[in-house]
Curated annotation (Swiss-Prot):
Gene3D superfamilies: 3.40.50.10210. CDD domains: DMB-PRT_CobT. PANTHER family: PTHR38811, UPF0284 PROTEIN SLL1500 (PTHR38811:SF1). Coiled coil: none annotated. This is UPF0284 protein VNG_1572C. It comes from Halobacterium salinarum (strain ATCC 700922 / JCM 11081 / NRC-1) (Halobacterium halobium). Belongs to the UPF0284 family. One of its GO terms (molecular function) is nicotinate-nucleotide-dimethylbenzimidazole phosphoribosyltransferase activity.
């Protein structure tokens, strides 16, 4: 990562009905409003406040969306950003690049992402046509770690993912993925080497877009950083299963790296991803609600938080300045 003016930050925002399964996600205090989370995150990244979204996303305990952190870093570093509509379920006031993909169905449906191939191709073309030295790719999709587990299962990779919840509901996710495999008539590893099919039958629209975007950019000679945790590592697995071997970096947070249930180091190593971990040292402001919940194990990552923090560090911006900016954005929104 370089953090230069030739760095472009792309946020893929979408939805999956898998998020409606009780106990799966903390991405929104009210399940009825969870579908607005990606749309709100896009607005927060773009404007620093919501525009059309009815709420600022918070967890049931009040943990603010990682978009607050990413926006704070953007205000400090000044990196260029864009939002890709990767299956939004609700409208956003942020300008978006369209891929034509619809919101994903529950992965326990036979074909939760029927338009995966078209979206992958559209994202590939967009990534291949970009003029930038470095592309940092992020995601926002409630329920995305469960769909990531589904894709890993289809590809035959270890089924280990993180969670936005303090206690990762691994057993629940495993049951959902087992049901999804059965619904699609699949066994573990049946779609190894078939990344688009893995997303179509076991994934979500954001994974299709992120993987296509990364593959296109890499084929164009652009450096690619996957900004996130196990979901972005899963996107890396999709790229590898498509036969792309160029170097990629996974930039994540200390919260994901410290989550024993996530196994991020092993997952990244399996996909030949270099790992950058950034610690925002929230302990220094542990009484502030914008940071306390992260220290308690909530959220951990999302909206490219790890990638944004890495860009701040590489720009020589201290984490004390980052924490102050986070408080400023938190108070504003």
């Amino acid at each position: 990562m370089s953090g230069t003016p030739d760095t472009l930050f792309a946020l893929a925002a979408g939805a999956t009905r898998t998020a409606a399964i009780e106990g799966i996600s903390a991405a929104g205090a009210d399940p009825a409003l969870m579908a607005h989370t990606p749309s709100a995150d896009a607005e927060l990244l773009t404007y620093g406040h919501t525009v059309r979204a009815p709420v600022v996303p918070v967890s049931p305990s009040g943990c603010p969306t990682p978009a607050v952190i990413t926006r704070a870093v953007r205000e400090l570093v000044g990196f260029e950003s864009l939002v890709i509509d990767a299956g939004l379920a609700e409208p956003t006031g942020a300008p978006t690049v369209t891929t034509g993909i619809s919101p994903g169905a529950d992965i326990r449906d036979e074909t939760p992402v029927p338009d995966a191939e078209a979206a992958y191709s559209a994202a590939y073309e967009f990534g291949h046509g970009l003029h930038t030295d470095e592309l940092v790719i992020a995601e926002t999709i409630p329920g995305g770690t469960t769909t990531a587990m589904g894709v890993l299962a289809a590809l035959g990779e270890p089924r280990i993912v993180s969670s936005s919840l303090p206690n990762n509901p691994v057993a629940l996710k495993e049951r959902v993925v087992d049901d999804a495999l059965a619904a699609s008539g699949l066994e573990q590893g049946d779609l190894a080497g078939e990344p688009v099919a893995a997303v179509r039958q076991m994934g979500d629209p954001v994974l299709a877009v992120v993987a296509g975007l990364a593959a296109g950019a890499l084929d164009a000679g652009i450096d690619v950083t996957l900004a996130g945790g196990t979901q972005l590592a899963t996107a890396g697995a999709l790229v590898r299963h498509d036969g792309v071997t160029e170097p990629m970096t996974l930039a994540t947070t200390s919260f994901v790296a410290g989550d024993d249930s996530a196994g991020i180091d092993a997952l990244a190593a399996d996909q030949d991803l270099a790992v950058t971990v950034t610690d925002p040292a929230f302990e220094a402001r542990e009484s502030h609600p914008a940071m306390a919940a992260y220290l308690d194990g909530e959220a951990k990552e999302g909206v490219g938080m790890g990638g944004a923090l890495a860009l701040a560090a590489e720009a020589g911006i201290g984490m004390d300045s980052v924490r102050n900016a986070i408080i400023s954005v938190y108070d504003r929104v």
